[in-house]
């Protein structure tokens, strides 16, 4: 499951993301954060952390450096 999620994120980064403007307010980017979280915490908790991060990535959030802890 973990490998499948990471492959889906990499597919998104390679084929879908280049067509969009760069809009992530965080370092590392939300997709890299998702990969790091899934690798560190597994598919379930890592995905939950990634979804929470993506929800915070909006114009009303300051952003900045936010690594997986």
Swiss-Prot record:
Chief site of localization: membrane
Keywords assigned by UniProt, alphabetized: Cell membrane, Membrane
Protein's cellular compartments: Cell membrane
Pfam families: YidD (PF01809)
Membrane topology listed for this record: Peripheral membrane protein
Keyword Transport (UniProt): no
GO CC, one annotated term: plasma membrane
Similarity annotation: Belongs to the UPF0161 family.
Annotated function: Could be involved in insertion of integral membrane proteins into the membrane.
Protein's UniProt name: Putative membrane protein insertion efficiency factor
